[in-house]
């Protein structure tokens, strides 16, 4: 009798455990994401931020940046970055500190075109397509160079209205292609990401509505003039969107297709990319929104450091990269950076190790760091809580330490 009772209890216990396990496994994983306004407000909690930043194609319509059948291999370097100690603002940090505190979901370091360090975190994998944010601006700059080399754009001194007559009679009358590339149009613009009334957020609202191809002109034509063109720097995502519209008008080709033709396929990217659109089947948002895997961002950086060459021939004019990656003598660029043609430069006071460096940078911690003098490319994919200003550790201090370490090995 006691034995039968024991067996019954044991059986019930096993059934309970099995049912409990089934119940646990049946719980759906949380795949919810935030919206575009949440990204720019900086209102997402950490896990949801990662889910959102890795799935923005669920927020905006996109066009595929097609990869080819031939993938360019990235081999392992004999110089491996196995450990790192560095000082930032008087405190000592290591690699895990930087990843954790600056919320880096992906880091890739290429030395002489080979992988010296690669790390993924917060659930991100080598196959995750992550948002570039404004790093896309540096891609667009390179496409302008390609359009000049291909003869679609005659000169950077051409007026913008030659290619975009929609801007005739606006504050962009008399602004050159070069002025746009330098963010020095002289047109008034407020880039504040967290201010719903800013020009940047007005642009975002058009993108959220996704109901009109080329809607950017509805905002840009209404802007007023603040200064003469070519004199003062004023960061404007709207102007890079205009540059994208200009390239598309000149080439008569969607930006994603031109990027695929000139870079994605010939460079040997491993995966298709995506590019945000202003409307379904509409125009690419030139100022942001390229989605790619970490290694493909790295391949683009190495392509730039190698002179933007395909089969030994550069896709941009002679001297383009040196010009694009050098600071322009215009007022208004503050902090440790200068600005070229949609590329950030680094001022000497940030450290001699950054001499000749140029960078693509995007909100929430995205960057593409190119150090030609040491043949080093570093890609950082971030999931920081706020669009700007919330990194715990100065990225430039970390980047300098990586370069110094690899130089010493």
Residue spans of the language-model regions?
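Structured C-terminal helix/loop/strand segments within mature extracytoplasmic catalytic/sensor domains
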Residues: 27-40, 360-409
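Active-site helix/loop module of the DD-peptidase/beta-lactamase fold
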Residues: 131, 150-188, 222, 249-287, ...
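Active-site Gly/Thr loop motif
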Residues: 269-274, 325-377
């Amino acid at each position: 009798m006691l034995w039968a009772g024991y067996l019954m209890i044991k059986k019930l216990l096993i059934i309970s455990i099995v049912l409990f396990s089934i119940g646990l496994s049946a719980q759906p994983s949380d795949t919810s994401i935030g919206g575009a306004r949440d990204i720019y407000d900086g209102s997402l909690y950490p896990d949801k931020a990662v889910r959102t930043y890795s799935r923005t194609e669920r927020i905006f319509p996109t066009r595929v940046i097609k990869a080819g059948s031939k993938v360019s291999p990235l081999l392992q370097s004999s110089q491996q970055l196995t450990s790192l100690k560095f000082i930032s603002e008087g405190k000592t940090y290591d690699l895990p500190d930087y990843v954790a505190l600056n919320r880096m979901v992906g880091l890739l370091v290429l030395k002489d075109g080979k992988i010296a360090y690669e790390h993924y975190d917060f659930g991100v994998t080598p196959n995750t397509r992550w948002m570039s944010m404004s790093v896309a601006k540096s891609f667009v700059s390179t496409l302008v160079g390609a359009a000049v080399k291909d003869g679609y754009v005659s000169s950077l001194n051409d007026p913008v209205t030659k290619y975009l007559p929609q801007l005739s009679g606006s504050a962009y009358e008399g602004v050159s292609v070069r002025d746009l590339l330098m963010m020095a149009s002289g047109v008034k613009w407020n880039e504040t990401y967290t201010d719903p009334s800013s020009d940047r957020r007005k642009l975002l609202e058009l993108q959220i509505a996704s109901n009109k191809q080329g809607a950017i002109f509805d905002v840009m034509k209404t802007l007023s003039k603040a200064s003469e063109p070519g004199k003062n720097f004023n960061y404007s995502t709207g102007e890079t969107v205009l540059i994208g519209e200009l390239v598309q008008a000149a080439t008569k080709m969607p930006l994603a297709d031109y990027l695929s033709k000139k870079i994605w396929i010939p460079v040997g990217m491993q995966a298709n990319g995506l590019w945000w659109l202003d409307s379904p089947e509409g125009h690419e948002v030139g100022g942001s929104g390229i989605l790619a895997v970490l290694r493909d961002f790295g391949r683009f950086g190495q392509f730039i450091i190698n002179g933007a060459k395909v089969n030994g021939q550069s896709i941009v004019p002679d001297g383009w990269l040196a010009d694009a990656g050098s600071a322009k003598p215009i007022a208004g660029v503050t902090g440790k950076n200068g600005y070229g043609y949609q590329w950030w430069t680094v001022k000497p006071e940030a450290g001699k190790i950054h001499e000749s460096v140029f960078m693509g940078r995007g909100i929430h911690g995205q960057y593409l760091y190119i150090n030609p003098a040491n043949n080093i490319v570093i890609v950082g994919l971030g999931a920081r809580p706020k669009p700007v200003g919330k990194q715990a550790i100065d990225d430039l201090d970390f980047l300098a330490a990586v370069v110094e370490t690899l130089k010493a090995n």
